[in-house]
């Protein structure tokens, strides 16, 4: 992996900086590094592809070195360099695609393609110029089974889940009470509702709770908590649990009371926040517990009183809600992230070249299914292909 990164970084710098008119002295160190890369690669043959519709390609390296000059780089010099650069970039692109197309149930973090395994050989260790990439550092740590720390912004940690539970129900579905939620990506929205607006509840208060277990623990998370769930703020028709009928939900939004959010790790409470909204932080957690109340307003204007009658029919449904959004966090496992294109890059390559479904990843790289059953094998393979995708993204946009 270090060799692949060093090759890509060298090629990116060469493509950007070896241009006509540049003083040789300004790029002399880069050209020496470039020549070291050529010397190491010359005389070697590689093969990529041969999986799905990814074509088999053979690569032979036999390039001359870039010379020195006392003046600016001229057009001929740059053209010679450009021919070499483009061949190397094409090679790296195909190595990366070949690697992203492959998976293994055992030692999935190690190189899987023939070309990538060859690049991992001892003779290429001289190509090791700059390995400051966060992904490379974490890949090295994970490869040695040591602690890693990926920093994510809006991590896709929650598998998609959208449903409801009813704590009070009737065949006519005309006096319901319960919760509904939507968990996806880095956000939880949950709403508690009571058609009768807690008219018969103790102290006219209904209590709601929503618990979400993460597939991987997060640390040092910055979180936004809001006393609203906008996705449940408009009327809708909902299929009943048994699919036999549908019921009407017509929310009128109230502010939730006694809001409490707990962050737990292995069943132990790590952080607790009560009636605190906006930005909060959580130190270390693998479970989130949200609890909140719907209180029937003790004093109402005639207009509000008309919304919440003492008896049926209940045409408007009292609703309270919360939104919890993870803005950034650290995780020891690699995750898809809304601010990165790595999952999209890997999925696009696998779809474009009709890569057959293997023993590790789900069809179409379905993220909800992948994160729901996030096995160590999937984690290893995902870290490898994401690292390769991050390297490829330096050269291929």
Swiss-Prot record:
Gene3D superfamilies for the chain: 2.60.120.170, Viral capsid alpha domain
Gene Ontology BP terms: fusion of virus membrane with host plasma membrane
Keyword Glycosyltransferase among record annotations: no
InterPro entries in the cross-refs: Capsid_hemagglutn, Rotavirus_A/C_VP6, Virus_capsid_a-hlx_vir
Binding site for Zn(2+): 153
Keyword annotations from UniProtKB, A to Z: Calcium, Capsid protein, Intermediate capsid protein, Metal-binding, Ubl conjugation, Virion, Zinc
Keyword presence, Ribosomal protein: no
A molecular function GO annotation: structural molecule activity
GO CC annotation: viral envelope; viral intermediate capsid
Subcellular location: Virion
Region Interaction with the inner capsid protein VP2, residue ranges: 62-73
PTM field: The N-terminus is blocked. Sumoylated with SUMO1 and SUMO2. Sumoylation of viral proteins seems to have a positive role on viral replication.
Remarks, miscellaneous: The VP6 trimer contains a zinc ion located at the center of the molecule. The zinc ion is not essential for either trimerization or transcription activity of the DLP. Zinc-depleted VP6 has an increased sensitivity to proteases.
Family of the protein in this entry: Belongs to the rotavirus VP6 family.
Known function: Intermediate capsid protein that self assembles to form an icosahedral capsid with a T=13 symmetry, which consists of 230 trimers of VP6, with channels at each of its five-fold vertices. This capsid constitutes the middle concentric layer of the viral mature particle. The innermost VP2 capsid and the intermediate VP6 capsid remain intact following cell entry to protect the dsRNA from degradation and to prevent unfavorable antiviral responses in the host cell during all the replication cycle of the virus.
Self-association and partners: Homotrimer. Interacts with the inner capsid protein VP2. Interacts with the outer capsid glycoprotein VP7. Interacts with the outer capsid protein VP5*.
Name assigned to this protein: Intermediate capsid protein VP6
Species of the source: Rotavirus A (strain RVA/Pig/United States/Gottfried/1983/G4P2B[6])
């Amino acid at each position: 992996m270090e060799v692949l990164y060093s090759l890509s970084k060298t090629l990116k710098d060469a493509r950007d900086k070896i241009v006509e008119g540049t003083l040789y002295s300004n790029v002399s160190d880069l050209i020496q590094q470039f020549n070291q890369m050529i010397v190491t690669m010359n005389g070697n043959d590689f093969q990529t592809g041969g999986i799905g519709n990814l074509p088999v390609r053979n690569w032979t390296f036999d390039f001359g070195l870039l010379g020195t000059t006392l003046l600016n780089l001229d057009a001929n010099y740059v053209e010679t360099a450009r021919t070499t650069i483009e061949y190397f970039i094409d090679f790296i692109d195909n190595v990366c695609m070949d690697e992203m197309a492959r998976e293994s149930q055992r030692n999935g973090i190690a190189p899987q393609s023939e070309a990538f395994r060859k690049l991992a050989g001892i003779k290429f260790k001289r190509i090791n110029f700059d390995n400051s990439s966060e992904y490379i550092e974490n890949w090295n740590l994970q490869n040695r089974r040591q602690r890693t720390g990926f920093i994510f912004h809006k991590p896709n940690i929650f598998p998609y889940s959208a449903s409801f539970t009813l704590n009070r129900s009737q065949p006519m579905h005309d006096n319901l009470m319960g919760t509904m939620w939507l968990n996806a990506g880095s956000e939880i929205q949950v709403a508690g509702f009571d058609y009768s607006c807690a008219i018969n509840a103790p102290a006219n208060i209904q209590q709601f709770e929503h618990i979400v277990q993460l597939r991987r623990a997060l640390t040092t998370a910055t979180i936004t908590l809001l006393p609203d769930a906008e996705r449940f703020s408009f009327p809708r028709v909902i299929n009943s649990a048994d699919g036999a009928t549908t019921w009407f939900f017509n929310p009128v939004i109230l502010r939730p009371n006694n809001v409490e959010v707990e962050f737990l790790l292995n069943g132990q409470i790590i952080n607790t926040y009560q009636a605190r909204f906006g930005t909060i932080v959580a130190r270390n957690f693998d479970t989130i517990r949200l609890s909140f109340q719907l209180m029937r307003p003790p004093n109402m204007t005639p207009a509000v009183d008309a919304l919440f009658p003492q008896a049926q029919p209940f045409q408007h449904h009292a609703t309270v809600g919360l939104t919890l959004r993870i803005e950034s966090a650290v995780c020891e496992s690699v995750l898809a992230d809304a601010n990165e294109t790595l999952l999209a890059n890997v999925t696009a390559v696998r779809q474009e070249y009709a890569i057959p479904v293997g023993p590790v990843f789900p069809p179409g790289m379905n993220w909800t299914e992948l994160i729901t059953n996030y096995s160590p094998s999937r984690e290893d393979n995902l870290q490898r292909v994401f690292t390769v995708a991050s390297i490829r993204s330096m050269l291929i946009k």
